[in-house]
Amino acid sequence: MRLHGLIAAALAAMAWTAAAQAEPATAKVVLHAPLRILDPVLTNAYITRNHGYLIYDTLFAIDTQGRPQPQMVDRWTVSDDKLSYTFTLRPGLKFHDGTAVTGEDVVASLARWEQRDPMGKRLAAATQTMDSPSADSFRIVLKQPFGLVLETLGKPGSPVPFIMPKRIAQTPATEAIKESIGSGPYRFDAKAFEAGVKAVYIKNPDYVPRQEPAAYFSGGKVPMFDRIEVINVPDAQTAVNALHQGEIDFVENVAPDLLPQLGQAKGVTVERYGENTDTYMLRMNWKQPPLDNPKIRQAVLAALNQTDYLDASLGDPKFYRLCGAMLSCISAYRSDVGATQTRPADLARARALLKEGGYKGEKIVVLHPTDVRSLSALAPVTAQALRSIGMTVDVQSMDWATLLSRRSKDAPV
């Protein structure tokens, strides 16, 4: 649950995929959440980000070592004082509407994205000018050194700096785009889209992958199917049954208790797709009382137990591990300093901190996503923990898209 920030419930969960062993011209897949929001700049939902990676392309991309590699960019130069970056685009890049990708498209796309993304805002603050000297190039001139220019342009976390036509990128960053047109390996079939139900992607015949082999987000993106249909199947058992029967080809998140069924199925492969694929985080609205009080937030931390969350979501300890690092648990920047969150809950200390913080029974709203299986079990755990130390809790259930919209607002509940 990428509710970035908080008090340390950084619970690393191991995610699983299941795919039928076949490569049909059409791939029918079930992903972790229903797709409702199409604008990859307007939301940081990973379901929308993944939608974006199918139809858009990026200037740079991160490889398996975490290093930025060129994607849409062919070559670039950096001035001796590290203040001027000039980039030349790969030849022949075309949007799905047939128009050529230009430096002006890049500048407009980055200008919109910078208004929504934290790293983009930092880059913008360090930038003096951003322009397009020629049709196939763009330039960033800094007013002060910024050592993460390439890393920022290639960041895979939402919102991703996807490149779209200038006419679309000129949409205000507070409004949703009305067309989903990129230059990526697949075209989005807008007529076939049913929000929260179905999304269809058609192979882009004009897409030319890079020659380098694929490596994480970088390298050649080779379309393996002529058509991809993303289908929402809310019930986990129904999705597994459909996989058994050959009605779908891929399930992104498999409920752990259903893995034995898949392990015995012919023609089905079950794989873990990463060592640190998901990190659950509990994020509090620290701008509003009573959670603007550090003592109250410390009380919440003392009341939580990572194992309770992971058992509720995943069940078997072999599918998860405890981790107290605020950054990625496999990152070179990992540190367990101050990692109290992996200790058992201390309810007596939590109650004492509440009293010390002057808690007066104010209502705490816990947002509960009902249509994302891996997340739906978490809110009840939080509610029970807070109630156990005497806090007033209001659990509000909603779909994931509504939660994301609600979460982006810091106004009182």
Question: What does each model-identified segment do?
Answer:
Residues 21, 88, 122-194:
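Surface-exposed binding/hinge segments that line
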Residues 186, 320-356, 372-377:
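Structural transition elements
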Residues 209-261, 384, 392:
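Ligand-site clamp/hinge motif
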Residues 67, 156-229, 237-238, 347-348, ...:
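Gly/Pro-rich hinge or "lid" segments in bacterial periplasmic/extracellular proteins
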Residues 74-119, 133, 138-141, 242, ...:
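Aromatic- and charge-enriched surface segment that lines or borders ligand/interaction sites
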Residues 30-80, 111, 181:
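N-terminal lobe/hinge region of extracytoplasmic solute-binding protein
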Residues 235-236, 320, 351-413:
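Ligand/substrate-recognition segments at binding pockets and active sites
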Residues 287, 291-331, 377-378:
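Periplasmic-binding protein-like
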